[in-house]
């Protein structure tokens, strides 16, 4: 993939996350200051490679799971140490530090993630899975009319046992669409951060949202939540 194709793919991912509608060549042409014909040729190649696709009802393009994975991998490589700054970081820290009991700290961190990301938030507390913001998830355009609701419910039912058995060891893990080990058909991305707590050396906090989301912002927030909880709880 050329550097321009990478930039176009990133722009499609970010634009689609913002507007929730397929991205057309005319908008990309304005962003990159080239002709629409040039953009159409580049998008055709990205589609041939499997990074974007054309919905049946639109002339625009949307990212595929493969496209999202390429984008997320690039984020991790180019911005490995990004931290959330400003108001969001302060909100997370305040909600955690002023909560009192460890369980309340974790719940507050999840609730704050829900408010900041507009996704479903979750965390393990011992052998329990705390979930908040289900209405956020089902309020997204991808799930209107009950689409994939059963698959999402199955994912949530099986998530805590899977986390306990698989015990992902990375500080931050991102499972996109079909990569989800317990909900491949749900059309969701699971972003989780591992942290140490009084309940377990492998506790997890994160979000579940549609594959269409602002990965940079959500990954930073989830990573920061895990760091904050470990700093406060694991002493």
Where in the sequence are the language-model features?
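Short, leucine-enriched amphipathic alpha-helices that occur as contiguous helical runs
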Residues: 5-9
């Amino acid at each position: 993939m050329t550097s321009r194709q990478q930039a176009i793919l990133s722009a499609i991912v970010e634009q689609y996350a913002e507007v929730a509608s397929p991205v057309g060549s005319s908008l990309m042409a304005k962003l990159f200051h080239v002709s629409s014909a040039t953009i159409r040729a580049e998008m055709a190649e990205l589609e041939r490679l499997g990074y974007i696709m054309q919905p049946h009802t639109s002339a625009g393009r949307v990212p595929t799971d493969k496209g999202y994975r390429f984008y997320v991998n690039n984020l991790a490589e180019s911005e490995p140490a990004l931290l959330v700054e400003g108001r969001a970081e302060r909100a997370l820290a305040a909600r955690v530090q002023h909560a009192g009991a460890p369980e309340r700290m974790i719940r507050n961190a999840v609730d704050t993630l829900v408010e900041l990301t507009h996704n479903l938030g979750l965390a393990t507390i011992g052998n329990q899975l705390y979930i908040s913001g289900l209405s956020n998830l089902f309020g997204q355009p991808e799930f209107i009319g009950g689409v994939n609701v059963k698959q999402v419910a199955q994912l949530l039912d099986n998530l805590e046992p899977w986390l306990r058995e698989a015990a992902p060891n990375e500080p931050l893990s991102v499972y996109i669409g079909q990569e989800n080990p317990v909900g491949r058909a749900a059309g969701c991305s699971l972003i989780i951060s591992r942290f140490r707590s009084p309940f377990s050396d492998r506790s997890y906090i994160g979000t579940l949202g549609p594959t269409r989301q602002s990965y940079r912002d959500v990954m930073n927030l989830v990573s920061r939540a895990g760091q904050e909880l470990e700093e406060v709880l694991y002493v």
